[in-house]
Swiss-Prot record:
It is a multi-pass membrane protein. It comes from Janthinobacterium sp. (strain Marseille) (Minibacterium massiliensis). Catalyzes the transfer of an acyl group from acyl-phosphate (acyl-PO(4)) to glycerol-3-phosphate (G3P) to form lysophosphatidic acid (LPA). This enzyme utilizes acyl-phosphate as fatty acyl donor, but not acyl-CoA or acyl-ACP. Signal peptide: none annotated. Pathway: Lipid metabolism; phospholipid metabolism. Its EC number is 2.3.1.275. Probably interacts with PlsX. Keywords: Cell inner membrane, Cell membrane, Lipid biosynthesis, Lipid metabolism, Membrane, Phospholipid biosynthesis, Phospholipid metabolism, Transferase, Transmembrane, Transmembrane helix. One of its GO terms (biological process) is phospholipid biosynthetic process. Belongs to the PlsY family. The keyword Lipid metabolism applies. NCBIfam families: glycerol-3-phosphate 1-O-acyltransferase PlsY. The chain crosses the membrane at residues 3-23, 51-71, 85-105, 116-136, 137-157, 158-178. This is Glycerol-3-phosphate acyltransferase.
């Protein structure tokens, strides 16, 4: 029962869409109404407000980190261990993808997934982040960087810790993240994907 409560709390935390909240605070257009229509930091950046984009990125990453950090530090006292951590990791990620507070229309989960990985293990999160940065710098495609980082994340976890239930959670997040980028994959193949820094109206 405690595991379910932690997972439910994680889902609700994940359901807070910082792209929408931050945009409202800055009196910007709803990110679901322009560009890629994705409520995420990259699309908020297309508004031209870098501060709002950075706050969105930090907020989405922080909620993933917070949910996993809470269950890792307080879960054992309530009988919630590795299986619970894996469930919470998935729950907060699902909350971002399909948020109950925003009619189940959420983002693609890149920043939230990174927050989850950093909370699981700093080296795991750092390796995944470096992968994203290298690809983003080399090709200037945020989506391509996210896809490659997502593919490598389960391998990084496996190298660090071997096969366990949390690896399954990381793999599930990676698969969902790739799925959420289906349109981006099509655009990349067609040469129509927007590069970092461009303003797609």
């Amino acid at each position: 029962m405690n595991t379910v409560l932690f997972a439910l709390g994680a889902y609700l935390i994940g359901s807070i869409s910082f792209a929408v909240v931050v945009s409202k605070c800055f009196r910007l257009a709803d990110p679901r109404s322009y560009g890629s229509k994705n409520p995420g930091a990259t699309n908020v950046l297309r508004s031209g407000n870098k501060k709002a984009a950075i706050l969105t990125l930090l907020g989405d990453g922080a909620k993933g980190f917070l949910a996993v950090w809470l269950v890792k530090h307080f879960g054992p006292g309530y009988g919630v261990h590795e299986n619970g951590v894996a469930l919470v990791a998935i729950a907060v990620f699902l909350g971002h993808l399909w948020p109950v507070f925003f009619r189940f229309v959420g983002g693609k989960g890149v920043a939230t997934a990174l927050g989850v990985l950093l909370a699981l293990n700093g080296w795991l999160g750092l390796a995944t982040l470096v992968t994203w940065l290298v690809i983003a710098y080399a090709f200037r495609y945020s989506s391509l960087a996210a896809l490659i980082a997502a593919i490598f994340a389960p391998f990084y976890y496996g190298l660090l810790f071997g096969p366990d239930v949390i690896l399954l959670a990381v793999l599930a997040m990676s698969i969902l993240l790739v799925y959420r980028h289906s349109k981006n994959i099509g655009n990349l193949l067609a040469g129509k994907e927007s590069r970092l820094g461009s303003k797609k109206k």
